[in-house]
Swiss-Prot record:
Chain's gene name: rps8e
Keyword line: Ribonucleoprotein, Ribosomal protein
Record carries keyword Magnesium: no
Name the record gives this protein: Small ribosomal subunit protein eS8
GO CC terms in record: ribonucleoprotein complex; ribosome
A single GO BP: translation
Recorded GO MF terms: structural constituent of ribosome
Lineage: Archaea, Methanobacteriati, Methanobacteriota, Thermococci, Thermococcales
Pfam families the UniProt entry points to: Ribosomal_S8e
Native source organism of the sequence: Pyrococcus furiosus (strain ATCC 43587 / DSM 3638 / JCM 8422 / Vc1)
Family label: Belongs to the eukaryotic ribosomal protein eS8 family.
Keyword rRNA-binding among UniProt keywords: no
Length: 127
């Protein structure tokens, strides 16, 4: 079933709002990508509003981790330690922006949106 992101058809009082038009395709949404930690990266290209394209990362194995000096490295993701978006995401190894991930070189905080950007960028946390 599609996700409709249009205005509610109910008034605050509970009464119905009768629209003078049908639902529009532009008001449709999609399920979240829920990027997981995996053995190799998996990307999906989807068509978006205006015929544009969005790269959706569905499975991630590597992250671009940057240190304080700005030097970056491509490192393997081991697991998700903490995720402020939802505490169940850490248990399910789902990566979102703001998640703390464990990598080969230490803990890092995700700064990109993997479901929107198609890549995991992170900054190294000092321990």
């Amino acid at each position: 079933m599609a996700i409709w992101q249009g205005r509610s058809l109910k008034k605050p009082s509970g009464g119905r709002i009768v629209l003078a038009r049908k639902k529009r395709k532009r008001e449709l949404g999609r399920e979240p990508s829920n990027t997981r930690v995996a053995e190799q990266d998996k990307r999906k290209i989807i068509r978006t509003y205006g015929g544009n394209r969005k790269v959706r990362l569905t499975a991630a194995a590597y992250a671009n981790v940057f240190d304080k000096s700005g030097k970056g490295r491509k490192v393997r993701i081991i697991r998700v330690i903490e995720n402020p978006a939802n505490r169940q995401f850490a248990r399910r190894n789902i990566i979102t922006k703001g998640a703390i991930i464990e990598t080969e070189i230490g803990k890092a905080k995700v700064t990109s949106r993997p479901g929107q950007d198609g890549v995991v960028n992170a900054i190294l946390l000092e321990e």
